[in-house]
Amino acid sequence: MEERVLSSFENEKYRIRVFYEEFADSPNGVYDMVGVMLFTYDNGKLHEECDWRTLLGKHSDYNITMKEALKELVWKYVPHDKMIKFLKKGTEHYQLKWNKTKRRWQFWYDERVFGSNPCVLFSSDSEDMHCGYLDSDMLSKLEKSDIVELINKYGKDIVVTSLTTYGYCQGDIQEMFAYCTKERFNEMVETPKNNWKKKATEFMQNELKECGCWMWGSVYRVKVEEKVYFTKRYANGEEHEDFEYEDCECGQTFYCEDYDEALEWVKKDYIKE
């Protein structure tokens, strides 16, 4: 069965056609990206095709939520005292307050989001405020946006960004995240390293967009063929000019929202106005 042509362009020299690429790999698995890509299945667990191995280690279990993945970044890159400082200051969603009467810290939620009752986290005589305790009782209560704010504000040599992508059916939505360390940026990018967080974020936003296109099936293969001209000569002496197509590029893959966008990218390389 012949493939369906989604879009095409033809002139005296080339024929360019765009097809769906049904079996494309995730772009983060195809080529090196500046960011470490994190996205999930419909059940909220990390997707097998995201870069969970970079975050957790190749022998780890990737069956965790996005919030748990972001918390891993907190423990790796945010100093403990900065964590407490951030929690004390609070955000629009919560605030950590000291209850003088009960002599313990209490986690106060915005009742419009969490309900009116405070959640007791740890008492003043609990000197062993180790990471596991804080992980279960504190960071789990935060919104993902709060955790990202914490990392970007106090994380050492790391930047995190996110992008919300939408599918083609009602309710198709995916909030995808990416992070990059200063060390990784220096290895991946040859441009000047000043203001590296801003530059890394710009790279990662584009990379997340490509991963989102893959997630929703917006992947296209562009085939370029050159017209090779020749002359047919018949026994009766007649001549007829004809041509045949010769492959130039048979499988250039594009992760983009519209197939015409893929066509225009290739036309820039082959068609001179």
Listing of model-derived features with the role each one plays in the protein:
Residues 1-273:
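Acidic interaction surfaces
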